[in-house]
Amino acid sequence: MLSNHLQNGIESDNLLWSRVPESDDTSTDDITLLNSHRDGDGGVNSLDYEVIENYAYREEQAHRGKLYVGYYVAVKWFFSLLIGIGTGLAAVFINLSVENFAGWKFALTFAIIQKSYFAGFIVYLLINLVLVFSSAYIITQFAPAAAGSGIPEIKGYLNGIDIPGTLLFRTLIGKIFGSIGSVGGGLALGKEGPLVHTGACIASLLGQGGSTKYHLNSRWPQLFKSDRDRRDLVTCGCAAGVAAAFRAPVGGVLFALEEVTSWWRSQLMWRVFFTSAIVAVVVRTAMGWCKSGICGHFGGGGFIIWDVSDGQDDYYFKELLPMAVIGVIGGLLGALFNQLTLYMTSWRRNSLHKKGNRVKIIEACIISCITSAISFGLPLLRKCSPCPESVPDSGIECPRPPGMYGNYVNFFCKTDNEYNDLATIFFNTQDDAIRNLFSAKTMREFSAQSLLTFLAMFYTLAVVTFGTAVPAGQFVPGIMIGSTYGRLVGMFVVRFYKKLNIEEGTYALLGAASFLGGSMRMTVSLCVIMVEITNNLKLLPLIMLVLLISKAVGDAFNEGLYEVQARLKGIPLLESRPKYHMRQMIAKEACQSQKVISLPRVIRVADVASILGSNKHNGFPVIDHTRSGETLVIGLVLRSHLLVLLQSKVDFQHSPLPCDPSARNIRHSFSEFAKPVSSKGLCIEDIHLTSDDLEMYIDLAPFLNPSPYVVPEDMSLTKVYNLFRQLGLRHLFVVPRPSRVIGLITRKDLLIEENGESSAVELQQSTSVRGRYSETATRMDAARPLLDDLLG
């Protein structure tokens, strides 16, 4: 019992430690989300990843048999299957739409410029403008939470932050159709980050049975009522999004593990890997189906996979220095990109976007016009180059036939045997432009002047575009930027080491990895993704080298891109390491400014309503008194649970005396206390109480958490931070140092051996643990090994 741990009573000024210890707000875990998309009251709350083991929960668990446990496990795996299928189909739809819009746009433009370049430019600009306008209109008018990549918001959700609107059905729709418009409209952004958000939305909607607002819900799948279960599903959705975007199932698993999740369990690894595998099957099936030509312009190049298996087979020791230089350049440009996007986004939010949705739409349209003018106009200023003699041997046609786009684009050239190298990059889809930069056997296809021009202009466009009111990812733009300066370095190496068999495309690949490492600061997952999308395992050591260097250089200047954006949006992430100044602080110092409101075990309904209406605390310590008058803390009750009790009224009683929870018939199931994702949940204004109701009482003992986590007041704040984050807590009690110890648990008290070979260890175990295990072992027979592996 918690009361045995708190013999000396409590001090109301240092009882709770919440997610933001430096907050001056009296609300311990209600944090205002500044300058963000608001839905409802505009704030964010912490999620309850800790299982509230109250009497209602324990009674429900006691009545669950093997059949229910098997059903529970089966539904988890079935939902993992549905998440993989749903995310894969969403990715196919997005890519099919983007490729066809881009194909029709370029085909029409190339057809018109055969007669008039000005008319072709007008058509090209108008098509891009319509697509971008549709994307911005959908976001501003229908789904404001779908703007941006969505990864900082999902990372915050998996870190324990409930951000309104992030996982709604309309956010999913806005993300899908908004991505089609923004990417198809030629903006300097990608669809990979939005696909991660899309997978998370699909997972969340499946976990709650659909959307109640749009009457697209069902009761039978509403099994996962706890935030802990929903967190696992959203993790599967994030991995599925990466797997669908890059056709990299292993990379998707590692991305979820390295970048977005804060808590990871071995059982979750099974389902995440299974979900990513399902995505890979769905995507490859769709790709094979589209090879027959029924998908229009969408074919083999629809998903961003760039096969460089025919590139450079080996490397020389002399090449390590220029490769290290690529890593340094990636770290510098990545850190600069993060800082510039921070300034641009901050200015945009504080000045421009405050003027309303119309300004957001106009801004996106202006950027679309500028991007179209640059991508069409700059190649006109570049002189065409004659086709190289080695092109026929490589199997690549030079120039491309009219109406085609790819390598060696004939754009504003005087003769048919010429190509425009700047148009080959600019006047193309991003996927095909990257494929051109990565391509082997295309020595000297691009001039240094064209690559420098493209690098400067596209880098600027990527900075300016990031933060507009459209869905935007930074994976592909980052690959574009990195592959450009990587190919530049490769050109220098080719000219410096004339006799070596060096491919410029290999250096372009290393440059892409270096920029992503310098901007996003991912290592393991990004390394695997780059290997999977390029189908070249031989380059793995080189990719690892440039990633390590670029990350180290970038970390010397600022945080990663997603951390910077999360901080800008006011998402209170708990990072893996506490801040340095916490080493000099203790737990008591972190919560001295807080005003903690305690509730008695049996409380008047009027007092509960008054307390809930006068503050926004989400957790309340519940106290009781011994016969000698000593104050004891008996647990923690959540605000959401109190609201459910007030609304139902079935637990009201006339007597102010406590009842025996074990002998009481609990009239609530544990799932009734869960807050749905797609709605704001209950608030005190939604509850109507009569004057007779207000005079009645509630015994809180059956509904409180009798065993919350507790730390002494003089524990170091770094230790408190690690405990709070690793356990996924929402509240943590800070109490005076207890005066009495009732026991000491060691490793041997928690070990239970099931075979006779380890009897020596078993004899050392706690008698109570072994006795309890012997009572339950007969009930957990043959089904247990399977359930232990699958349940979680």
Curated annotation (Swiss-Prot):
Predominant place of localization: membrane
Segments forming domain CBS: 592-652, 704-761
Transmembrane domains' residue ranges: 78-98, 119-139, 170-190, 195-215, 237-257, 267-287, 320-340, 361-381, 451-471, 474-494, 508-528, 529-549, 731-751
Gene3D superfamilies named among the record's database cross-references: CBS-domain, Clc chloride channel
Any Pfam family the entry gives: Voltage_CLC
SMART domains: CBS (SM00116)
Classification via InterPro entries: CBS_dom, CBS_dom_sf, Cl-channel/antiporter, Cl-channel_core, Cl_channel_pln, ClC
UniProt-reported outcome of changing L187R: Abolishes the activity
Compartments, as annotated in UniProt: Membrane
GO molecular function: voltage-gated chloride channel activity
Protein's UniProt keywords contain Cytoplasm: no
Membrane topology, as annotated: Multi-pass membrane protein
Subunit details: Homodimer.
Name of the molecule in the record: Chloride channel protein CLC-d
